[in-house]
C-alpha cells in the first residue's frame, strides 16, 4: 500500500470563496448543470432511498481538509460507497487532476485523466438511474476511460460488491462520502441511522493510515451512547482512532446546503490508533482541529470515549476537569407514571412541563417520592429548559422534567446561572431535549471551600478567561428562558 504522509492540511470554512472554487474547479459545463439539477431531490427518492445529494461547495470544503499529499499520490485508491450521481468523486477527480499535473508520468492530461478514472476512483451505488448518470458524466470527462462504478448494495451481508470491480479491489486509502441517514422513510418511518453501518463498514475498508471522510449526524459526539436503532457506540469507535478534523453545521445551515432539517457534521478519521492513548507528555499529544457549530475553530486533545460539545469547548473542558475531581451534580430522571395513570386526582400536584405561559400541572391521588422535598425541577422537553425552584416541596413531576433533589447553595447558584443554560445548549447534540450527559459538565462545588454568591464569583472559581466569560454572556449562543410562575392545566 502506498504510504500517505501526514502533512498539515489547509483549513477553510464553507464560504463564498469555497463556493466559487468548487464551481470554477469543474470545467465541464454540462456536468456542472447536471449536478446542479440533481441537487433538487424528489420527496419520494428522499423517503425511499435516503437520498441527499451533497452540494459542491461542501464537498470541496471537506476534501481540502485532507493532507495535501493525498492529491499528489497517483497510487492511492478512493471509494464512495453511496456515490449517488458521483458528484463527490467528480470534485475529487478535478482536485487529483490538478494535484498530479506535475508528477512524472502523469503530466499528459488525457493519460492522467484516464489513470485517475480507471485506477484511483471507485464507486458503489444502489440506484441504477444514478449509476447511469454517473457513467455519463465520467464519459464526458474522458470517453476512452472505463469508470469503476457498480450498482450494488454496500450493506449487503454477502458483500457481493467485492467481486464486482474489474480488479477485485477490496481495500482503499480514502473512503469519502455522504451516506444515507434513513432508508424507506423519514421521521418515524423506515430504517433509522443507517449511516452508522456505512461508517463502521467504511472504516473496515481502509488500509492502515487511510482516511474516512464522512458527512453524517452528530450523535457520535456523545460519549458512552448507543445510537438509536443502529445500537452501536460510534463515539467509542471514532475516538479510539485519530480524528483529524470535525466541522459542525446548524440545522439552518444544513437546510440551506442540503435541504434537510437536521444538524450534521463532517469528520475526517485516520485509520490508526489515537496517539493520545499512549501519549506520555504534552509534546506527544495530538490535537484535532474542530470548527464548532458557531464557526469558531479550536484545537482539542480528544481521548477515547470523549464527549465533544457543540461549542464552548474550552469552558466545558474546565468544567469536566472539576467534575472528575469533585463529582457531578445528580440529575434525577423519574420513572413514576402515577400522575398520568390515575385519573381525576386532585390531591397532589405534579409538574408535567413548563412553558413561557406557566407550569403545566397533572394531579394525582398518590404522592411522588419527592413531594415535600426541596428541589430544582428542569423542563426536560423542548427548546427551553426552564428551571423551577420548588423550595417548599409543593410538586412531584412526571417523566418529562428532570430534577435535582435538596440542592446545595452552590448548586442553586450554578443551575440558576447563565452558565447552566450555556452548558445545556452546548450539549444538545440530538434535538432540543435536555441531554442527561450534561451532568458531565455540572460539577459539585464544595461549600467548605467557597460559597458562591454571584456569577462573577462562579466565573472566578472556574478560572474562566475574559474571552470565555464574554462567550457565556453572548446571547447568540443561547437564550435564558423566562416563564410565568402560574399553574396551568
Residue ranges and their predicted role:
Residues 2-247, 251, 263-279:
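SAM-dependent methyltransferase catalytic region
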Residues 7, 177-178, 302, 365, ...:
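Selective for proline/serine-rich intrinsically disordered segments
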Residues 45, 49, 170, 251-471:
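C-terminal substrate-recognition regions of SAM-dependent nucleic acid methyltransferases
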Residues 139, 217, 416, 474-477:
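Short amphipathic alpha-helical surface patches that mediate protein-protein
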Residues 157-163, 256-260, 341-344, 481-483:
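Short, solvent-exposed polar/charged micro-motifs at secondary-structure junctions
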Residues 235-239, 416, 473:
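Alpha-helix boundary recognition
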Residues 470-489:
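Short, amphipathic C-terminal "tail helix"
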